[in-house]
């Protein structure tokens, strides 16, 4: 189930990234003692992987980037005796706009990436005079921020998937950004930055239909576009908010020593060596769900541009968050999924109580430790396991079948490469477990197609000769009475009410959906074996404890971060199964000093086992019995009939004595 849940989360991310919804538009805000190996049995099938945990791992990765950048700043500026290209020492630069510089803001909107038409009044979107560099108290809300809203009349080229750019110029007071106005233009008094404000996103279309009727609920226009442009179409999308930040920073940067990703924003003048004020286009809080496609039905587009000062520390945070993923070589599909994961993080930051969010991040670190320990104990358990008593071997085979179904499903749905690799590794681990629960040999006499050796599978003797196989077969026979009718009902429902690409896709999606919904039932055979054996001594409780704790942490994530209802129900039902394990541990208590039904004990073996004491020989000296021993002996003598008179002699000491009967509690356990 772990791989199934992971692929389900990744698949939904890809579908969501495919199209933008014209939902409600929001304004762009600034947010601001370990048992021996032979006593450890098989664990139940893997639990569903927490999709929310993937989100938290993304947060931790970004925290690491921020820490790395902050660590660089704590080192102080680079030494000034570094040699430059010409052999001259590099010196620290300064900001071309000193503190409290009076400046003007000019914002132009254009279809062209390089803007030159300063005389076109239609291109001028916003002009703000007399701004003070480093002023944090002006503006409508006394926070140094200003904003401007207007409707943009878009040309036909933009309606037909063209690009649109925003060009921002900051000039010192009294100067103009147009280089053709020689008297009013100064190169060192003008800073310019431009950016494409529309965003191209992939919209995927899968041609599906009802396999019985041949009908589909897809939009006819979408079907036509899929026939014209193929299953993947790149469409321009729009978000009406963008923030222009000017960083209030006067750090003596040294050219060539600015660390990434900050180096792409710090621009140096080639002549003076000083750097221009840092302009940053901030769209971090623009959620993907608020983007909508641009088409010919839109004659105008709303645009709200905000201007705010930004501190150096917050700029480092935004730059680290916006840095490109190191996995960009894996394809653009990973970018789209990364955008969706970042949206989950942003929603959690905006909608979750800060204390609860901090607690969640702390617990997530504990989750990662438990996840690693559970995986390590699982591998160690199967690698060192010699006996299969008490283990459900059929559950291992069912896990392999389940992993193969998930792998074929994600391949059929073209999930991104990272998920495919992770699921494939899970399949290899499940296949390796088969070699630990069965004797696998290669028959080189009867080859497949006369070329490849034929693999043969045979049950291990420790499994066949024990009662575990009988109980395992019985458990799966009872389980089939439930699973097969449910599978048939789900197959009929999927065929009647759902759409599919073809019969192959229907089989995979039906099996995949069935495993997601009812796969937890396959955890019950181990419970049944425990019940029939009246023992849990064979279970690896350390690994089960790690998995149980992780499941409870999953519950926290599922209710803190937005998750589908079925995922939350899945976490709850896994909790129920673990509580049943705990209940069995309570009613089938294990005495660590008692040898269980498999001939194993929880105590470490000693060099010499204790033997029954023989009666002392005649004339031998013995110590006086303690009062407790005397009392117990008196009680035993009173509760047993007097033995028949036997001749006393030295030979009686060597006769074997009958072992005392087991207590009633031990009989009940047996």
UniProtKB/Swiss-Prot annotation:
Region feature Disordered, mapped onto this chain: 1-51, 609-670
Topological domains annotated Extracellular: 2-354, 412-416, 499-502
Entry-annotated residues carrying Phosphoserine: 601
Pfam family, one: CLPTM1
GO molecular function: GABA receptor binding
Function: Involved in GABAergic but not glutamatergic transmission. Binds and traps GABAA receptors in the endoplasmic reticulum (ER). Modulates postsynaptic GABAergic transmission, and therefore inhibitory neurotransmission, by reducing the plasma membrane expression of these receptors. Altered GABAergic signaling is one among many causes of cleft palate. Might function as a lipid scramblase, translocating lipids in membranes from one leaflet to the other one.
Keywords: Acetylation, Developmental protein, Differentiation, Glycoprotein, Membrane, Phosphoprotein, Transmembrane, Transmembrane helix
Biased composition (Low complexity): 1-16, 609-632, 646-657
The protein's name: Putative lipid scramblase CLPTM1
Glycosylation sites: 28, 119, 161, 241, 295, 413
Family per record: Belongs to the CLPTM1 family.
Modified residues (N-acetylalanine): 2
Annotated transmembrane regions: 355-375, 391-411, 417-437, 478-498, 503-523
Cytoplasmic compartment spans: 376-390, 438-477, 524-670
Any one Gene Ontology BP term: cell differentiation
Organism: Bos taurus
Gene Ontology CC, one term: external side of plasma membrane
